[in-house]
Amino acid sequence: WHVAEESIHHRDEDTRSNFLNAIGNILGDSRFILRYLLKDAGAEMGYRIYTGSGLVIPGSSVLTSDPFFLNGELLKEHRHFSLSSGAYKAIVETQMFLKRNVNPVFLGGFIVIDYPIKESKYGYLPPIATSVSLSASIMRYDELMSSIDIGLMMSHSSQGKWNGLPEPNSESLMLSPSIGYLFNTRFGAVALNLQKPYMIFGAFVQNEGDIDQRSDVWQISFALRFLSKRE
């Protein structure tokens, strides 16, 4: 590591504590979004289209200096992670869904863009984050009125900057196909979903120093929606 310590990275720590280049906290960013319904077919067949915009307000858990020492400073102990970038961001989003009477009965998707307004007060300009999602629902018309849901999400992050210098490992592209199963019960609807992210390029694709390492991520989610009781 070019310093006297055994490691300048590996410590038992979390975001609650302060460090040499970090302010600790348990709170990350706050997101405020206003949405406008452009078109709504209601219970009939047709389109439902939303548009929205908002603001990301940075949290208190931030890095206070460049953890990559891009200006050529002497390497010293530092932290790379925080819950917030420390920068304000604008949010723009659009959602469009189509309800049909043939399979797939639901088709749709959304696009969300988080665009940094300016650098944080510590000189960090976060990447532009873009998420695009497409989904479809196929009804099975069985006793449970179940459906099979398939989807694909693309997440892209542009290159961030510290004090005007490109941040390593910040640019990335990830594709996440998913499949789910939704069925109805006496008390409500139950949904199970399985998602497999694939990093196309970015920090988890590169392997510096030919290290014997890999990452393999699966995401499983469970949702339960209760029916309200009516007199």
PLM feature segments, named:
Residues 1-6, 37, 52-65, 95-101, ...:
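Short glycine-rich beta-strand segments
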Residues 7-11, 46, 61-67, 121-123, ...:
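Outer-membrane beta-barrel and related beta-rich outer-membrane complex signature
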Residues 22, 26, 82-88, 97-99, ...:
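Short, contiguous, pocket-lining structural segments
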